[in-house]
Curated annotation (Swiss-Prot):
Membrane disposition: Multi-pass membrane protein
Gene Ontology CC terms, in alphabetical order: extracellular region; plasma membrane
Protein's organism: Salinibacter ruber (strain DSM 13855 / M31)
Stretches that traverse the bilayer: 12-32, 52-72, 109-129, 168-188, 207-227, 247-267, 277-297
Similarity-based family: Belongs to the UPF0182 family.
InterPro entries in alphabetical order: UPF0182
Pfam families xrefs: UPF0182 (PF03699)
Cell compartments where the protein resides: Cell membrane
Region (Disordered): 917-952
Keyword terms: Cell membrane, Membrane, Transmembrane, Transmembrane helix
Record's compositionally biased regions (Polar residues): 931-940
Name used for this protein in its record: UPF0182 protein SRU_2225
Length: 952
């Protein structure tokens, strides 16, 4: 008895230790999370999410506990006394711990096992809190699937939870059945005896009841498979095709009924032995399963579908096209034609000054190295990324590149107080115009140095301290030290560094002993408890990276990989794009190969997140209120979201179309722009992203932000957009280009410009080839490469301009000794010409000048012919020739001065003069005038060639 009592005490002690361990493991994290969310005024998020988890945990634990506990109780009850069972050895019951294994002890053991299994089930299923909330608060999409007529919101918001619940039911039943079979076999109630199968009737009834439970779960699974079938890939159609709709769907309905019938037969055998009937039912069930879901679909596919696949699959291809376009918002794209003239007009530069001034020459992949070398200033600062944005600079709309100066991940002197008390924040940012360079090929900085010096008032920030950022390291304690102490390094300066004391509201109060103890345990750093730096007003700042903050505030959103810094009036802000997604959407082709979005079938950029870089405040603004998923989350978290109009206007001016979302859309659009089933089936017009050459390697061109005047719109003026040229799959010529608009009121509009298909329009890779084939350019690049420097060709930018294209590629040199990229040349190209000069303007003048010379030569040949006929001219024709000579002289002066706009104007006027006074040819007939083409390339008959060329 003393041994038994000691065993019970040990069990109680182990139970207490387990509870304490669980509390210590789980509770600190929950308390810390609650404090953190409360500091941001989002405590309701904590209670909603954790409440849903607790509810799921408790419900699943109770259901699983009742199921396992009840089954184990029946199992033990069906086992005869152990000393009389087949376990007994020489009439003695087995012992455990020196005590007989009685029925009561076995019952308690069964309850322990049931409790452990229930805990595992409950812990796993509680992670489905998001599915539960979406299911509970689901609304309507307003559009039905094309097969069952069920609202699409069912697939996106309800089906995932139902599938999880069905899987849990089947898993519970299967595990319970497996445990019962094992228990009965060990107890000798089921087994092979004397060459035959023997089973206790009570054991069979118990197992039969659990088998019914399993079959009911299977029947439910077959029913849910009806909806899952609309999302499965295979064959020509992604989703349910001809075979699925006409064979598999009826077979699934049959399997639902057959499974229920089989469950009924098992139930009948609980009370009346009808093993023969049960055997026939089981065999028939297998025949239906294999025949209906394997053999019949295969035969129909081989005999009916494959011989005329396009014909029979046409309506389902249409479903696939329509639903995928809906899932990725491709149906909202506006499609227009773009003439893509082969030549730029002579006055292209003068007519598009603002666009030319905003062509991005600085490649972010190289500019980051320049920033690091020239502007990190101290070893404890680092630049991690460069973002492209736009600002109004003294009334001019300019494209700007910006990078925050953040704390490095590894301090030079990595002591505890340096890491957590003294080096607490980054400082300011660096920015430059995208198309300007300063001395020696470096950027022309708009904001630079420490403290930041800005050339424009719109870039000035009163408080440039960055306590929160993209890569902000570890936690820190602010303010530290006694009131009045300034322990934090604000920024370095000559002589003596500038120190400061944090005066913001970011962070969780850590002044009390209990909170210091809590955070010491949670952070695994007991210096928090021991340090003298912490005072009553001290706060601990943690989860300081933008991605971390958004993930803890809204873990149900996917975050874009590129948050970007914005200059505010008083401080810096980060803007991040967040997405609502679903892995369930009928007939939608899922995302493959894009990290973080694998398996996604529906996506919307529904949220813009703003993070205060000084206080750490997180604000979420709904940018797509029509999205049914964000509508659901607004019902779940009524205090979390704000309308986009509530965002400060200064920040609204900096929202942009996100690159991740655009790339996902373009990966789908490259195929799903083919809306005709036959074209889609044959991939007759498949597009792809073009290749470009970067750092001597071929790679896929990335979308890029550009500031230009979008063709075909009603109002003229620059606007900020994300652009990507497209080429036919397997070819390098350009077939179209896509622009995603970012400026209000047109934010979110995507325009696709399709190019003529009856002639060649050079794509980026073909322009790269033309550059390689240019002897002068190739020789110069090779020469630089041989002089101890590396030549890197930056990203090629395609600029739509004057119904044509301008191609621009910067050339950088990187010395082997000092890794500072310097922009040495800029290549400009059109469809016809290419030039490399020191600046973009010089390259443009060279390219356009070659076109003008060609135009001039054509015109001068006709001028020479006209001069030869002057003797036979009438007085009116003589007067016209005199005026023509004056215009020729003015055109020559303009050409020599590089004034192509005036040159074009004079040729236009010359054309008009010659049209009004036609000149006789040498045979006495009047030749028809030659008109200017739509590119602005002028040809007209004129006088003496030397009048224009100056005799050269």
């Amino acid at each position: 008895m003393s041994i038994l009592r000691s065993s019970r005490l040990l069990q109680i002690l182990l139970g207490i230790i387990g509870v304490v361990f669980t509390v210590l493991l789980v509770t600190p994290g929950l308390v810390v999370e609650y404090f953190w969310l409360s500091e941001l005024d989002y405590s309701s998020v904590f209670w909603t999410i954790r409440g849903a988890q607790v509810l799921l945990f408790v419900l699943v634990f109770l259901v699983a506990g009742l199921y396992f506990g009840g089954n184990f109780r029946v199992l033990i009850g069906n086992i005869p006394p152990l000393w009389a069972s087949r376990w007994a050895q020489e009439g003695e019951a087995p012992e455990v711990g020196g005590e007989p294994l009685t029925r009561d002890r076995l019952q308690r053991l069964g309850y322990v096992v049931a409790g452990v299994l229930s805990l595992l089930f409950a812990a796993g299923f509680s992670g489905r809190w998001n599915d539960l909330l979406r299911f509970w608060y689901a609304g309507s999409y307003g559009q039905a699937d094309p097969v069952y007529g069920v609202d699409l919101a069912f697939y996106m918001l309800e089906l995932p939870f139902l599938q999880s619940l069905q899987s849990a039911v089947v898993g519970l039943a299967f595990l319970g059945l497996l445990a019962l079979v094992t228990g009965y076999v060990i107890a000798g109630q089921i087994g092979i005896q004397d060459g035959g199968f023997e089973a206790d009737s009570g054991a069979l009834r118990h197992l039969g009841a659990n088998l019914i439970f399993l079959l009911l779960g299977w029947a439910w699974g077959f029913y849910l498979d009806l909806y899952e079938l609309l999302q499965e890939g295979g064959g020509a159609v992604y989703g349910a095709g001809y075979t699925d709709v006409n064979v598999v769907i009826p077979a699934l309905y049959v399997m639902v009924a057959a499974t229920l019938v089989l469950a009924g037969l098992v139930g009948l055998n609980l009370y009346r032995r009808r093993l023969r009937l049960l055997g026939i039912g089981g065999a028939g069930y297998l025949v239906l399963l294999v025949g209906g879901l394997v053999l019949a679909p295969s035969l129909v596919t081989q005999l009916t579908v494959l011989p005329s696949e396009l014909q029979v699959e046409r309506p389902y291809l249409e479903n696939n096209i329509d639903m995928t376009r809906e899932a990725y918002a491709l149906g909202d794209f506006k499609e227009r034609s773009y003439p893509a003239q082969p030549d730029l007009p002579a006055d292209a530069v003068e007519q598009n000054e603002e666009t030319i001034d905003n062509v991005r020459l600085w490649d972010p992949r190289l500019l980051i190295d320049t920033y690091r070398q020239l502007q990190e200033i101290r070893l404890y600062y680092e630049f991690y990324s460069v973002d492209v944005d736009r600002y109004m600079l003294d009334g001019d709309y300019r494209q700007v590149m910006v990078s925050p100066r953040e704390l490095t991940q590894q301090l030079p002197e990595d002591t505890w107080d340096n890491r957590h008390v003294r080096f607490t924040h980054g400082y300011g940012s660096v920015s430059n115009l995208v198309a300007r360079e300063g001395s020696e090929g470096s950027p022309e900085f708009l904001t630079q140095d420490i403290p930041p010096q800005s050339k424009y008032e719109s870039l000035d920030v009163d408080n440039p301290a960055l306590y929160y950022g993209e890569r902000t390291p570890t936690y820190r304690i602010v303010p530290a030290g006694v009131p009045g102490d300034s322990l934090e390094l604000d920024y370095p300066r000559s002589g003596e560094n500038k120190y400061t004391r944090y005066g913001g509201e970011g962070g969780v109060s850590v002044g009390s002993f209990w909170k210091q103890l809590l955070f010491s345990y949670y952070m695994g750093d007991f210096n928090i408890l021991l340090t003298d730096y912490i005072q009553d007003d001290s706060q601990i700042q943690f989860w300081n990276q933008v991605e971390e903050r958004v993930r803890h505030v809204a873990p149900f959103l996917k975050l874009d990989k590129d948050p970007y810094l914005v200059h505010g009036d008083d401080r810096h802000y980060y803007i991040a794009d967040a997405y609502t997604t679903s892995n369930s959407f009928p007939y939608s082709e899922p995302i493959r190969g894009q990290q973080g979005y694998q398996g996604t079938r529906y996506i919307r950029n529904s949220v813009k997140v703003v993070v205060d870089a000084y206080n750490g405040d997180v604000s979420l603004y709904v940018s797509n209120p029509e999205d049914p998923i964000i509508q659901t989350y607004q019902r779940i978290f009524p205090d979390l979201f704000q309308p986009l109009d509530a965002m400060p206007e200064l920040l609204q001016n900096h929202i942009r179309y996100p690159q991740d979302f655009f790339e996902i859309q373009m990966e789908r659009y490259r195929r799903y722009h083919q809306t005709q089933p036959q074209v889609f089936y044959n991939n007759e017009d498949l597009w792809t992203r073009p290749q470009e050459q970067y750092a001597n390697q071929q790679r896929k061109m990335e979308p890029y932000y550009i500031l230009t005047d979008l063709p075909g719109k009603d109002d003229a003026g620059l606007e900020f957009m994300l652009m990507l040229p497209m080429t036919p799959d397997g070819r390098d010529n350009m077939i179209g280009w896509v622009a995603a608009r970012s400026d209000p009121p047109n934010y979110g509009e995507v325009v696709v410009y399709e190019l003529p298909k009856d002639r060649l329009i050079r794509g980026p890779n073909q322009i790269e080839s033309r550059i390689d084939q240019d002897t002068e350019i190739s020789q110069q690049l090779s020469l630089w490469d041989q002089r101890g420097s590396s030549v890197i060709r930056g990203n090629l930018i395609v600029v739509p301009i004057e119904e044509s294209f301008l191609y621009v590629e910067p050339i950088y040199l990187i010395a082997d000794e000092i890794q500072i990229p310097e922009m040495q040349r800029v290549i400009a190209a059109t469809d016809q010409d290419v030039a490399m000069k020191r600046t973009l303007r010089q390259s443009l003048n060279s390219v356009l000048g070659e076109q003008v010379v060609e135009t001039r030569d054509q015109a001068l040949a006709q001028m020479q012919q006209a001069a030869q006929t002057a003797q036979a001219a009438s007085p009116e024709q003589v007067e016209g020739l005199e005026r023509a000579k004056e215009l020729i002289q003015e055109a020559r002066d303009a050409l020599q001065g590089g004034d192509f706009a005036t040159f074009g104007d004079r040729f236009d006027e010359l054309q008009q003069v010659l049209n009004d006074v036609p000149l006789p040819d040498t045979t006495g007939t009047v030749p028809p005038p030659t008109s200017s083409d739509t590119t602005g390339t002028m040809t007209a008959p004129t006088g003496d060639v030397s009048e224009v060329t100056g005799g050269s």
